[in-house]
Amino acid sequence: MPSCGACTCGAAAARLITSSLASAQRGISGGRIHMSVLGRLGTFEAQILRRAPLRSFTETPAYFASKDGISKDGSGDGNKKSASEGSSKKSGSGNSGKGGNQLRCPKCGDLCTHVETFVSSTRFVKCEKCHHFFVVLSEADSKKSIIKEPESAAEAVKLAFQQKPPPPPKKIYNYLDKYVVGQSFAKKVLSVAVYNHYKRIYNNIPANLRQQAEVEKQTSLTPRELEIRRREDEYRFTKLLQIAGISPHGNALGASMQQQVNQQIPQEKRGGEVLDSSHDDIKLEKSNILLLGPTGSGKTLLAQTLAKCLDVPFAICDCTTLTQAGYVGEDIESVIAKLLQDANYNVEKAQQGIVFLDEVDKIGSVPGIHQLRDVGGEGVQQGLLKLLEGTIVNVPEKNSRKLRGETVQVDTTNILFVASGAFNGLDRIISRRKNEKYLGFGTPSNLGKGRRAAAAADLANRSGESNTHQDIEEKDRLLRHVEARDLIEFGMIPEFVGRLPVVVPLHSLDEKTLVQILTEPRNAVIPQYQALFSMDKCELNVTEDALKAIARLALERKTGARGLRSIMEKLLLEPMFEVPNSDIVCVEVDKEVVEGKKEPGYIRAPTKESSEEEYDSGVEEEGWPRQADAANS
């Protein structure tokens, strides 16, 4: 690979700083530091001069050296001084002559020997001739070869800037419609939000890059291409430090290199330059979303389905496990860590992702415990404030130990956050604000504030005698009038609610929608059970009346679509027990089976009687001995 003198990625750091034995005796105060890494796929050498630019380094490829002196590239010149003589992670039999590849010094070509340490297996080797030490890279490190870095850097940045045009909202809506039944308003909001997120990524290019493009007209580079080049340099610099085992922000060497890279990047206008500027660029800001609705209405399913069709990283995080910093539980930074993991630890790609915060209503504060520290409620909301608005989060690096403190900085300014929660009892709070009675079952004016009081009131008013359809319609009507003060009374702090400007209420599922959920969408409930029975060569037939009866049972349980699977498991328990290894070829379920008036019907295949098969299976039916005696006589 050619020298990197034309880029701004800085110098590459190596895993082991080596020098000659004479230089080691004089100390490292000389005018030159020599660093070498011996890898399975190649050898990377970097020379850093005291007063030379840090970015001036060279790279020498290396190949395997076989026993007969012929290199893997087929040159076969056998020159010991050639840097293309091989290296591998394992030396095989070494000097014993039993075959296998041998480690050779990339400087002089002489054989290297393992350094004896107190550890049984060492990765360090030494050249006896030129007294150089090398470290043998592992399989994981060899996969991150320096030779492949420019290609991976270009791919990582072009994913964000040179992708195909973002899908229109209608196309995203149609895709969600294949898997999620109903919730048309929520689908439209999510589709538009994702589309605008794509546009914000593609258009929020710093203004200084446009000015730089005007200055560098001879390069004929567009602002987007300049941004790609800059991010390629940053990406390559970060990956070189990771391969060398050095954090970009963890020591003096990495810090100095990062400072040099930052100095070469044009900064935004500040101070007097802003006052004198006559042109202001429009920067698109994000609009975080809050989905609220009853349990089983499809909030999490919408997020899971949306994650499949996106070209940006998408992470789903459960807020119930989050705690304030310093307490047992998952830290708030783990939200961004999951997004970084989904982006394959590409920081630039993760900074343009989408985070789905599930069960966000569970971190609501609980009134009445002010003498205690609410580490799982209000404390988590306070920790999420800057995360939602946009800040730099320190996330632990990949394969880094906690004690070492190596972190990666991720900017959350362009990360879109979508929160969701059931908010049980929120309709009671809205009803109290509107001074309305709730279906004639008393007034909640004497109830306390907070999510616990609201949930208790909602549970107390659940009665089997109430009209289920009327109850659902009333709740949906109230949720459509939700305001920020209702969420604050529920237990969310005002600062948290203000950072979620788009509030989307999801409606409850009625009987017709539940019947559609059973059969229509891809990966529906009934086709899943039909696939289970087909593995035992059996069919499952469910009548239309049975589907409606199942939907009515789910409505009475008030658990939404999740109640459908519970009902189906109870109905099909006996058939799933009887069908395997039997002659049943069809199971029929009708309305009476759902209502518990009779058992499921079975259709059996015609049997072929054979005395030999009965004898082999050990089955003795009544009258079988007499038939056998008659046959023998």
UniProtKB/Swiss-Prot annotation:
Residues with N6-acetyllysine modification: 437
Q: Which GO terms describe its cellular component?
A: endopeptidase Clp complex; mitochondrial matrix; mitochondrial nucleoid
Tell me which residues bear Phosphoserine: 617
Any idea which GO molecular function terms this record carries?
ATP binding; ATP hydrolysis activity; ATP-dependent protein folding chaperone; protein dimerization activity; unfolded protein binding; zinc ion binding
Q: State where the protein is found.
A: Mitochondrion; Mitochondrion matrix, Mitochondrion nucleoid
Recorded catalytic reaction(s): these are: ATP + H2O = ADP + phosphate + H(+)
Q: Where is the ClpX-type ZB domain?
A: 93-146
**Single GO BP term:** proteolysis involved in protein catabolic process
Region called Disordered, residue ranges: 68-100, 598-633
The parts of the chain that form a coiled coil are none
Residues at which ATP binds: 294-301
Q: Does the keyword Protease apply?
A: no
Q: Where is the composition biased (Acidic residues)?
A: 611-622
**EC number(s) reported in the record:** 3.6.4.10
Magnesium in keyword set? no
Q: What SUPFAM superfamilies does this protein map onto? A: P-loop containing nucleoside triphosphate hydrolases
Describe its assembly: Homohexamer that forms a ring structure; this hexamerization requires ATP binding. Component of the ClpXP complex formed by the assembly of two CLPP heptameric rings with two CLPX hexameric rings, giving rise to a symmetrical structure with two central CLPP rings flanked by a CLPX ring at either end of the complex. Interacts with TFAM.
Role description? ATP-dependent chaperone that functions as an unfoldase. As part of the ClpXP protease complex, it recognizes specific protein substrates, unfolds them using energy derived from ATP hydrolysis, and then translocates them to the proteolytic subunit (CLPP) of the ClpXP complex for degradation. Thanks to its chaperone activity, it also functions in the incorporation of the pyridoxal phosphate cofactor into 5-aminolevulinate synthase, thereby activating 5-aminolevulinate (ALA) synthesis, the first step in heme biosynthesis.
This chain belongs to the protein called: ATP-dependent clpX-like chaperone, mitochondrial
Q: What phylogenetic lineage does the species belong to?
A: Eukaryota, Metazoa, Chordata, Craniata, Vertebrata
